[in-house]
Amino acid sequence: MPSKLKKAIGAVKDQTSISLAKVANGATGGGDLTTLEVAILKATSHDEEVPIDDRLVTEILGIISSKKSHAASCAAAIGRRIGRTRNWIVALKSLVLVLRIFQDGDPYFPREVLHAMKRGAKILNLSSFRDDSNSCPWDFTAFVRTFALYLDERLDCFLTGKLQRRYTNREQTGRISTNSTTRSRFNPKAGIKSHEPAVRDMKPVMLLDKITYWQKLLDRAIATRPTGDAKANRLVKMSLYAVMQESFDLYRDISDGLALLLDSFFHLQYQSCINAFQACVRASKQFEELNAFYDLSKSIGIGRTSEYPSIQKISLELLETLQEFLKDQSSFPASSGLYPSPNSFLPPPPSSKDSAVSSSLDFGDSTIDTSERYSDYGSFRSTSLEDLMSRTEAGTSSPPMSCHSEPYGGGRDDPNGNNFDTVSTKSLPNNPSVSASNLILDLLSLDDVSNTAEAEDVEDKKKQDDSKAETFDPWEALMLRDDPKKKIETIEEEPSTAEDHQRDSGNWLLALEETATQVQGNNSMAIVPFGLDDPMPAFQAATDQYNPFLEEPVAQLATAGEPMITFGGLALTGFQPEPTFQVNVPDDFEPSSTPTFKATETLPMKCDPFTTFESFGFGETFSENGGVNQQSVLQEQQIWLQNQKKIIAKHLS
């Protein structure tokens, strides 16, 4: 408790400040400004035993509400008072006065306080404040700082429109009365009516936004808990009681808001559900701290016990249930960021605009997913007569449509790149306004389109057949040659283009065949494929050279006991040359009745142009000493070189 000397010094300071204010304002005209500053100095005196006089508060409120400029003068005066003092009593009384003006004063005052703080006034920014008037200053200094932080948060809520109601001291105590004055812009006795909607009338999004600010403000209120010697101080208790009254209303608003959110929790958007769950988790911890704060306030005798609300704690089971529900719903694909409501699990009514099919149709080896096609509502509509006419005018053919098409068929890709959508009867609009005449026109247009599509298919098949016939293969030309005297030149050739020169240059087989025909001259040998119209074509390989392995003519080798080699329709006489050596077999040797294996001669399956003439039926020409006759080979090469340029020019032209 301060000594009498300190009380006297404080009284002298207060009187000196009042005299200086009167002199300074009297020189500039005085009037309401002098009265306002004197009332502020008297309300924030150094006397700890004297609380703020309600009559002075009412006078200050009346002056502020009479003129807008007076609100700025009041904020400047309070800023000078707090900035110059090092006494916790003066600082705390100044803060309580600010709170009273916030509750019952002109709405322009909070804005002027903010402007004054931006200009450097230390009204609510008391982070550097320190008490020098007490032997135990930290308890009181901490309370002043936390009280200033609460007012700063309250100012933020009010300026952003998040504060639910303006808490008027007249409605709570009813002790404030004022003399009737004509200068006031509103009647103080009537109070200030709030035009903001009640909590029960707010939408979930607005409610979640405001609950977040209310919880921050409630945290600041809980932080004003006094410690040490400040618990027993009367001025501290009176200041804390004003904060307690606002915390009662904050708790009720938060509880009512959370109850409304939980009632509509399963019908909210997904992000709103997450915000509501976070608010519930924060409220469960905050309500425990608030209950402890109220118990402390009751123990030190702040207010009446009947004024305190009953704190309803949020159960842990409820939080676990909400958390499990959010985990389950997080697995669902969010459509446009919306949370799927329980109604989304029910089958939607059949409609052409709202039908969303997420099934997959299996057509053979390919699977067509129709979920993407029907993901956007209203994107699927039936084909109308106007659409078909517009497509016909544009020159695009419509796909063939059938009443037997698969229901809800997906998109079908044409080999030419056209994307066709299969239309079914289930895709027709379920709208009674559609007349029967429109449906008949649609059916007629569908028939026309189907006929046109069928005609185009027939033309495509003809073109494909023609293209197959036009393709020229030298091997096919050789195999289809059933007449030995028929020449390949009889095959009609299309006029070749520059792009086909390289392809035509590869027809070397024609040149080889022509050369072989010229070399033969008068030979009666002819190359005939096996298995053609002639059942037994002539196969002769007569040569003038001596062959030591052929002692008899080929025709005489075909005896009844010798094996016959048959391939296709051609019968060849197998022969075995005499061996150059013999094995002496004992007389008592008896051969087995049946051999273990039997070797058969093989003939070439294909005519390889790179092999010798023997593969085509020619026999090699051997010399008398068993070597190849070089003269005949050189003769063939000369004939080839003579006709090479002529053949190449003929086929490249």
From Swiss-Prot:
GO biological process per UniProt: clathrin coat assembly; clathrin-dependent endocytosis; protein transport
Occurrences of domain ENTH (ranges): 28-165
UniProt keyword Protein transport present: yes
Record keywords, A-Z: Coated pit, Cytoplasmic vesicle, Endocytosis, Golgi apparatus, Membrane, Protein transport, Transport
Motif mapping: ALPHAC-AD binding: 608-610
Biased composition (Polar residues): 174-185, 416-432
Example GO molecular function: 1-phosphatidylinositol binding
Cell membrane recorded as keyword: no
Places the protein is found: Membrane, Clathrin-coated pit; Golgi apparatus; Cytoplasmic vesicle, Clathrin-coated vesicle
Stretch list, region Disordered: 170-190, 338-360, 390-432
Motif interval(s): Required to promote clathrin assembly: 442-444
GO cellular component, one term: clathrin-coated pit
Coiled coil: none
Major place of residence: membrane
Protein task: Adaptins are components of the adapter complexes which link clathrin to receptors in coated vesicles. Clathrin-associated protein complexes are believed to interact with the cytoplasmic tails of membrane proteins, leading to their selection and concentration. Binding of AP180 to clathrin triskelia promotes their assembly into 70-90 nm coats cages.
PANTHER family to which the protein is assigned, alphabetical: CLATHRIN ASSEMBLY PROTEIN, CLATHRIN COAT ASSEMBLY PROTEIN AP180
Record's subunit section: Interacts with ALPHAC-AD and clathrin.
Protein's recorded name: Clathrin coat assembly protein AP180
